[in-house]
């Protein structure tokens, strides 16, 4: 039951890591679904069909990997000792799941046969230990492939010491090579909660081959102390092996020493896993055990496997080991969590610049919102508490001050102890705010006077309320008497302007003569957007009463306000809901920017005034074009004329970019005056009057030679002389 739970948890961890590597991990539901399919013994084709919706193009790759791991688990035995070792080697983050390793039970079994001899090193420089492993890449058919001659892979984790080493100690730095392919199935270690702690690896060189002693926290303790070991020491006084063991006893950390055995024995070793998938109650126990084991030390394994086909490399290492003499062994520290590698390809990863920009903008927005406290529409200055604005309240508090002075004893002493730092901090804040708001020096002196006046009062009451600086748009509360002598004169003005009620205090007012107290208004200084607090709204709505403009308000500092602003204030007090402010703003905008005339600018679109032009500039296209009857006076956009300035058509409906030169107007065509009467002129065709009102027929161009019988034009008739003219008479002669 325990072993099956552990194995199923490991498989689930590996599945989750693989999904994260493929970029398909969203939540815990997909690993749960895959575990159910594994428990139901789904085939690879069935898993590919079911998971294609979630994994897409990576489905075949994932199912091949998963079934390779499951086939590996089915092919091994169910020996409990080998189960735990194979569990470590298959699912550990430091070696791939398909590497050939050895179990810790077999390590202990062969420990007596090959006892390592402690050989110290006299070389002060740092060395790099060549840890050779036979790596296989998991394929669809689980075919094991060995690397080329001399190719050795190194462990993924970067090894660095857990403590400062003496100059005579050797530090072995084990880093991955660029050509390593051992990260295929190891990305799930990044999410493994058991890989959060570090392990200590001590290297002891034997007479013939180097062996690695690995310290782990198992269930039983190995008390073999024949070798000289350098362990992790949490206190500087514990420098010996005995002190390190005492520390292990106190902190309940148990270590186990494992050594490499002979290569012939290594070749015969096989580790097995037998998956057990039970009921839902067992799955619940898996989750509980997972939560419980997160607090346990990491169980990891560092394996060194020699490739015995290369005799030259072995002899070289033997010679190197033989040249090391001394009694100091090398201490290697392995950080359990490897450097995180991104599970997505670089093309699909989020842009880091966008993330950094979003973080910076979020921080800026947070700082901007926190600078304005809760009342975001007002700018606060920590100068003095708010004051009452009616003379009656002031006189009542001054009269009551004599009887209440004995009540201020211990608070004053406590405040005086912190007075220096508080005053200094308030002064700094005041200077910063004054410089930021660019307040007039006279107003700054006024604020300083008010600060001095209320120093004792703020200590007495421990009042944290702030002096309110307001824009004239809000309630401008104008202020108190310049002295008690002139107090009665300004009391009427205060009472007239006391529409804004201030929260009353029942604590003591100091017995001091009245000093000038002012409220500075920020005219033209921008204020952060926001709205009045609930307290301000209540005070404005409940305490507003119609205010009359006092005649004496222009005397003293009250006269600093512009008369127009005073009228605005009195009208605003009568209108607490803010509708007056909107009307005022609209009036100001009208005064500043006159309304445009509904007449098209004759210089558009070449008008140089732009938006400041008093005439209309068309924006949207005309829907009635080309049948628009307004032509160039239309308030909408017409297409440009291709003749532009050379266009001579006076009523051209197109838009002319350049100004047209006014051409000469065409001469009006005078139509011939119709005849006043259709009566034929009696003198025709001999009429010689040019303005003859009678009808004169038009002559035929062919005159007497016209042969058309139906010719409508006039043909002159040939006149025959009268008859008496044709009679010949013999002239009379005298005989």
Swiss-Prot record:
Signal sequence region: none
Cellular component, GO, one term:
nuclear speck
Question: What keywords are annotated for this sequence in UniProt?
Answer: Acetylation, Differentiation, Isopeptide bond, Metal-binding, Nucleus, Phosphoprotein, Repeat, RNA-binding, Spermatogenesis, Ubl conjugation, Zinc, Zinc-finger
Q: Where in the cell is it found?
A: Nucleus speckle
Residues with the modification Phosphoserine, per the entry, are: 85, 240, 309, 327, 343, 390, 409, 421, 498, 515, 527, 620
Q: Which GO terms describe its biological process?
A: mRNA stabilization; regulation of mRNA stability; spermatogenesis
**Which top-level group of life is the source organism from?**
Eukaryota
Stretches with biased composition (Basic and acidic residues): 412-426
Q: Where is the composition biased (Polar residues)?
A: 79-103, 131-141, 366-380
Where do the ZnF regions (C3H1-type) fall? Answer: 595-620, 621-640, 641-656, 681-698, 700-718
Molecular function in Gene Ontology: poly(A) binding; pre-mRNA binding; zinc ion binding
Q: Which InterPro entries match?
A: Nab2/ZC3H14, Znf_CCCH
Q: Point out residues bearing the modification N-acetylmethionine.
A: 1
Asked if Metal-binding is a keyword of the record, the answer is yes
Q: Where is this cross-link: Glycyl lysine isopeptide (Lys-Gly) (interchain with G-Cter in SUMO2)?
A: 99, 139, 175, 198, 245, 283, 295, 357, 378, 413
Quick one: where's region Disordered?
Answer: 79-141, 307-351, 366-388, 400-430
Q: Which PROSITE patterns match?
A: ZF_C3H1
Q: Which residues carry this modification: N6-acetyllysine?
A: 357
| Family under the similarity heading | Belongs to the ZC3H14 family.
Under the subunit heading, UniProt states: Homodimer; facilitating circular RNAs (circRNAs) formation. Associates with the spliceosome. Interacts with HOOK2. Interacts with ZFC3H1 in a RNase-sensitive manner.
What is this protein's function?
A: RNA-binding protein involved in the biogenesis of circular RNAs (circRNAs), which are produced by back-splicing circularization of pre-mRNAs. Acts by binding to both exon-intron boundary and 3'-UTR of pre-mRNAs to promote circRNA biogenesis through dimerization and the association with the spliceosome. Required for spermatogenesis via involvement in circRNA biogenesis. Regulates the pre-mRNA processing of ATP5MC1; preventing its degradation. Also binds the poly(A) tail of mRNAs; controlling poly(A) length in neuronal cells.
- This protein is called Zinc finger CCCH domain-containing protein 14
Q: Which organism is it from?
A: Bos taurus
Q: What's the encoding gene here? A: ZC3H14
